[in-house]
Swiss-Prot record:
The keyword Repeat applies. This is Calcium-binding protein I. The gene is cbpI. Residues 20-42, 82-117, 118-153 form the EF-hand domain. Ca(2+) 1 binds at D95, N97, D99, M101, E106. One of its GO terms (molecular function) is calcium ion binding. Ca(2+) 2 binds at D131, N133, E135, S137, D142.
Length: 163
């Protein structure tokens, strides 16, 4: 039986290879997200998993010249349950100007797109709870701190209030 990561790789590899317009076999994480948006439920999360498993040089792009499916599968499994994957995919989904921060406007706009009826109240609440330094934007560190807080208090039921 195939692992989750093998299934993910089998799902996305043909699409990515087929969409290489200039045939240089180099992709940024944003390009991968765009490619996956058509056929994936959570393209940001899949892109982060793929990027982390392939980007050995830790630069701004990944290369498909030396793909080793078994190594990718092993690496994806290693990252699969790490909270930073979800944090990074959350940032990719909501950070429209690619500054690695989520502004009040970016969050509200995305919530409006998703059909949230009370996006202003929800956005205000999220920022009140997570923006600890009150900069007016959510950073990776803010989100990471919130995830750690939730993990510490995992016996309590924590959820956003209905607004």
């Amino acid at each position: 039986m195939a692992s989750v990561s093998e299934h993910c790789l089998n799902e996305i590899k043909p699409t990515i290879l087929k969409c290489d317009k200039n045939k240089d076999r180099q992709y940024s994480i944003d390009e991968i997200v765009q490619l996956l948006k058509k056929n994936s439920k959570n393209p940001e999360r899949l892109a982060v998993l793929l990027f982390k498993s392939l980007n050995k040089k830790l630069d701004e792009s990944i290369c498909f010249n030396d793909i080793d499916d078994r190594e990718i599968s092993k690496n994806c499994d290693k990252f699969q349950d790490k909270p930073e994957i979800d944090i990074e995919s959350f940032l990719l989904r909501f950070d429209k100007n690619n500054d690695k921060m989520i502004s009040h406007h970016e969050l509200k706009t995305k919530l409006d797109e998703l059909g949230c009826g009370n996006s202003k109240k929800t956005t205000d609440y999220v920022f009140e709870q997570i923006d600890t330094n009150k900069e007016g934007s959510l950073s990776y560190e803010d989100l990471e701190g919130f995830v750690k807080f939730l993990k510490q208090d995992n016996n309590k039921k924590t959820s956003l209030p209905s607004v």
